[in-house]
Regions:
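RNA-binding accessory domains that recognize and position tRNA/RNA substrates
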Residues: 3-207
């Protein structure tokens, strides 16, 4: 099995059930988790993906390298808390640049017990996913870089998988609630708009 060369000080490790190991830089929560591994090719919407109920029990590999650069905006959550088990990215998240953001990706993951891992060859990892289906993995984040590789591989092999699980029960809200949020609006209001001369009614509806 091929093993990615270790960076100077790896603080995160991803172990596949077949023994393949990926090293990287951890962010978010510390600790270990086992899950199913999948990938997503979207260029935007990482927050929506992490909170999408359909990703429950899965570690998501993002093939687009710029993840985290728009921070976290509470209004963009698909559910109250992220349901994905963790995330794998090419480059470590940088400081966000988004006037709507209220939090950075790393602290947001940490406060919700989710592990992130950067510095990974996500193309190679995605090829492994395509070849193996949805491999079982163990993901670990330790600031000291102290990993028991054999134990992580065994943890990945011991993961029972998602087949047959009632995941809807885990991601559904505990009780009904009222939806009180309105359509988002610019807090300072909008300047008057002048419709172009000769513009169609359809164009005015869209403007």
């Amino acid at each position: 099995k091929m093993t990615q060369s270790e960076p100077m000080k790896p603080t995160a490790c991803l172990a596949l059930a077949d023994g393949t190991i990926f090293y990287g830089h951890g962010f978010g929560a510390t600790g270990e988790t086992s899950a199913e591994l999948c990938f997503n090719t979207a260029m935007t919407g990482y927050q929506e993906i992490m909170t999408d109920p359909s990703y429950a029990g899965q570690v998501v590999t993002f093939t687009f390298p710029h993840i985290g650069n728009t921070g976290i905006t509470p209004e963009d959550d698909e559910t109250v808390d992220p349901v994905s088990a963790g995330m794998i990215v090419k480059w470590d998240p940088t400081e966000s640049s988004n006037w709507r953001a209220t939090e950075e990706l790393g602290p947001w993951l940490a406060s919700r017990g989710r592990i992130g891992m950067g510095g990974v060859d996500t193309r190679r990892l995605t090829r492994a996913i395509r070849q193996q289906g949805a491999p079982h993995v163990a993901l670990a984040h330790d600031p000291d870089g102290d990993f028991d590789i054999a134990a992580l591989v065994q943890k990945a092999r011991d993961f029972s998988g998602l087949v047959g699980l009632d995941l809807a029960k885990d991601v559904t809200c505990a009780q009904s609630y009222q939806w009180n949020e309105m359509r988002w609006a610019w807090p300072e209001g909008y300047a008057p708009q002048t419709a172009p001369k000769g513009g169609s009614r359809e164009r005015r509806r869209l403007s």
